[in-house]
Amino acid sequence: MLCLLKLIVIPVILAPVGYPQGLPGLTVSSPQLRVHVGESVLMGCVVQRTEEKHVDRVDWLFSKDKDDASEYVLFYYSNLSVPTGRFQNRSHLVGDTFHNDGSLLLQDVQKADEGIYTCEIRLKNESMVMKKPVELWVLPEEPKDLRVRVGDTTQMRCSIQSTEEKRVTKVNWMFSSGSHTEEETVLSYDSNMRSGKFQSLGRFRNRVDLTGDISRNDGSIKLQTVKESDQGIYTCSIYVGKLESRKTIVLHVVQDEFQRTISPTPPTDKGQQGILNGNQLVIIVGIVCATFLLLPVLILIVKKAKWNKSSVSSMASVKSLENKEKINPEKHIYSSITTWETTERGISGESEGTYMTMNPVWPSSPKASSLVRSSVRSK
């Protein structure tokens, strides 16, 4: 039904209501916007007039280059906005057509979207066509994983690149520690709030600041004094009117800069937390194998240590004995030789003379020296 409506509406718009060949047009200079893959971009198309007039028609065209053929992104006529082709569900007319505004919001930007976007706008009861080109450059997708140490401060960026200011109406930051856990509000901003300020709630109170410039469509935040419990998934929802653009950041909190890098994937569900992953299983198997291989070596080392200890003890005993023998002084054994008186009758009545002989005895000699008795008979 929608395709049939397009076939009917497009010829009606482009033929009867199309611009005559001689219709004058006004082209302004083309601003440049740079946006990362997956983000949103707002391309302004505002007619600057002192009086406000109702927009009669808006066409947004895309071409890779100035000389390339153009394709329709979106067209607006008679209060009907129709996105076309590959831009369906991603392009939205966000300008206030009652105030000369035909701005376009393009969500989930892809690399193929890089090129020149031209807005052609005509006001009611005027023949002049206003043309405003915007050059879009698409950069690689920003990393979704952010690592920070405990106690440090980290920035989390969330913005809409735009040629116009003051288009963001609301910003919400939410936190979840897992896929099945309840979300917590980190920060909330609403342009309709009386205070016009943001609110940080719950355990993030007094630790979160809105550092982005809301007037420039920037809802970035700063998280201070990071805790281990802050690890998880942070989702930024930034609104232009009722249209929401989302950005997800996975925050990993580490103890120090030398700690092993945590896997960038968010916590899994289905009870997988209690199951070892492949890397852990390999590490455990390696430890077990190493233990079995090193056990015999350990046993040999223990036995060798005991044998060395026993040998050292024996040597110490021998040396102690030798030292003891050297320290003890020489001992002499004195023995007396008994003298017997003789009643033998001899010449001049002279009696025999008795003498005592001392021989040294060494402790190391196998046998003690015997007592030697010698008698010298008197002449």
Swiss-Prot record:
Q: Which residues form the Ig-like V-type domain?
A: 24-135, 140-250
UniProt keyword RNA-binding present: no
Q: What is this protein called?
A: Junctional adhesion molecule-like
Residues passing through the membrane, by range:
282-302
What processes does the entry annotate via GO biological process terms? gamma-delta T cell activation; heterophilic cell-cell adhesion via plasma membrane cell adhesion molecules; monocyte extravasation; positive regulation of epithelial cell proliferation involved in wound healing
SUPFAM superfamilies documented for this protein: Immunoglobulin
Q: Which residues carry this modification: Phosphotyrosine?
A: 355
User: Where does the secretion signal sit in this chain?
Assistant: 1-20
Q: In which tissues is it expressed?
A: Expressed by gamma-delta intraepithelial T cells (at protein level).
Q: How does it sit in the membrane?
A: Single-pass type I membrane protein
Q: Which SMART domains match?
A: IG, IGc2, IGv
GO MF: protein homodimerization activity
Output the superkingdom of the source species.
Eukaryota
The taxonomy runs: Eukaryota, Metazoa, Chordata, Craniata, Vertebrata
Question: What family does this belong to?
Answer: Belongs to the immunoglobulin superfamily.
Q: Which residues lie on this side of the membrane: Cytoplasmic?
A: 303-379
Q: What is known of its domains?
A: The Ig-like V-type domain 1 mediates interaction with CXADR. The Ig-like V-type domain 2 may also play a role in the interaction.
The entry describes its oligomerization and partners as: Homodimer; active form in leukocyte-endothelial cell adhesion. Interacts (homodimeric form) with CXADR. Interacts (via cytoplasmic domain) with the PI3 kinase; upon CXADR-binding. Interacts with ITGA4 and ITGB1; integrin alpha-4/beta-1 may regulate leukocyte to endothelial cells adhesion by controlling JAML homodimerization.
Documented effect of changing residue 334 to F:
No effect on interaction with PI3 kinase
Mapped to this chain, the residue ranges on the Extracellular side of the membrane are 21-281
The UniProt function text for this chain reads: Transmembrane protein of the plasma membrane of leukocytes that control their migration and activation through interaction with CXADR, a plasma membrane receptor found on adjacent epithelial and endothelial cells. The interaction between both receptors mediates the activation of gamma-delta T-cells, a subpopulation of T-cells residing in epithelia and involved in tissue homeostasis and repair. Upon epithelial CXADR-binding, JAML induces downstream cell signaling events in gamma-delta T-cells through PI3-kinase and MAP kinases.
Q: State the organism of origin.
A: Mus musculus
Q: Which residues form a coiled coil?
A: none
